Swiss-Prot record:
GO terms assigned for molecular function: adenyl-nucleotide exchange factor activity; protein homodimerization activity; protein-folding chaperone binding; unfolded protein binding
Species per Swiss-Prot/TrEMBL record: Prochlorococcus marinus (strain MIT 9515)
Localization in the cell: Cytoplasm
UniProt-recorded name of the protein: Protein GrpE
Biased composition, class Basic and acidic residues, residue ranges: 34-53, 219-230
Gene Ontology BP terms: protein folding
PANTHER family: GRPE PROTEIN, GRPE PROTEIN HOMOLOG, MITOCHONDRIAL
Gene: grpE
C-alpha cells in the first residue's frame, strides 16, 4: 500500500516535471514561430526589388517625356505669343498709316487755300477803314485754318538757309549766290508741310549755285563775247 502511494507520488512528480518542461519550452517555440514569420523570403524580396526598380525606371522615363512635352508646348506658346504681338503691332501700324493717308488727302486739298491767304497777306496793302476791316476778316479765317492744321498734327517747314534735301524740298530754280554756298536754299517759293513727322507736301524752293558758279558763268559769257568779236573781225578782214 505504502509502495503504491510512493509510486503515485513519484508519478505525480514526473507529471509535474513534464508539465514544467512543456511550459518552459512553449514560449521558446512561439518565439521561434514568430521569428520564422519575420524572416523574409529571399525570392519575394528579390521580386519586390526588381518591381520597384522597374517602377522607378518607368517613372523616370515618363518624367523625362513629360518634361520634353512641356518644353515643346512652352516653345510653341512663346512663338504664338510673339506672333500675336507682332500681328497686333502690325495691325496698329497699318491702322495708323491708313489714318494718316486719309487725313493727308483731306489736308492736302486745304493747303492751296492756305497758300492763297498767305499770298494775299503778303501782296495786298489795304487802304481805308473798310478795306482794313475786310482784310482783318479774311486774316481771321486764315488763322482758323492754320489752327485746324496744327490740331491735326500739321507743321510748316522752315527751309531758308537749310541744306537742300530732295526728300523734303523740290528745287524749282537755281541761281548763283555770293552769300550762300552751293545747295543752300535761298528762297521759299511755296511752303512745305509735315504731318506727324512725315512729308505732307514738299517745299518749292530756290537753291544757291554758290559764288564759284557765278564766276564760271561770267567767264563763259566773256569767252562767248570774245569769240563773237573775233568772228566779226575775221569777217571784216575778208571783206
Amino acid at each position: 500500500m505504502i509502495e503504491e502511494q510512493s509510486d503515485n507520488v513519484e508519478n505525480k512528480d514526473e507529471n509535474v516535471s513534464m508539465d514544467n518542461n512543456i511550459s518552459e519550452n512553449l514560449p521558446i517555440a512561439e518565439e521561434q514561430t514568430n521569428e520564422d514569420k519575420k524572416l523574409p523570403d529571399d525570392n519575394n524580396e528579390k521580386i519586390d526589388a526588381e518591381d520597384l526598380k522597374n517602377t522607378i525606371t518607368n517613372n523616370d522615363a515618363r518624367l523625362e517625356q513629360l518634361e520634353k512635352e512641356h518644353e515643346t508646348l512652352k516653345s510653341q506658346y512663346v512663338r504664338i505669343a510673339a506672333d500675336f504681338d507682332n500681328f497686333r503691332k502690325r495691325q496698329s501700324r497699318d491702322q495708323d498709316d491708313l489714318k494718316i493717308q486719309l487725313v493727308s488727302k483731306a489736308l492736302t486739298a486745304i493747303l492751296p487755300i492756305v497758300d492763297n491767304f498767305e499770298r494775299a497777306r503778303q501782296q495786298l496793302k489795304p487802304e481805308g477803314d473798310e478795306a482794313q476791316t475786310l482784310h482783318r476778316s479774311y486774316q481771321g479765317l486764315y488763322k482758323q485754318l492754320v489752327e485746324v492744321l496744327k490740331q491735326q498734327g500739321v507743321a510748316p517747314m522752315r527751309v531758308v538757309g537749310q541744306q537742300f534735301d530732295p526728300n523734303l524740298h523740290e528745287a524749282v530754280l537755281r541761281e548763283p549766290s555770293e552769300e550762300q554756298n552751293e545747295d543752300i536754299i535761298i528762297e521759299e517759293l511755296q511752303r512745305g508741310y509735315h504731318l506727324e513727322g512725315k512729308v505732307l507736301r514738299h517745299a518749292l524752293v530756290k537753291v544757291s549755285m554758290g559764288p564759284g558758279q557765278q564766276i564760271s558763268q561770267e567767264s563763259e559769257e566773256k569767252d562767248k563775247v570774245d569769240k563773237d568779236i573775233d568772228s566779226e573781225g575775221s569777217i571784216s578782214e575778208e571783206n
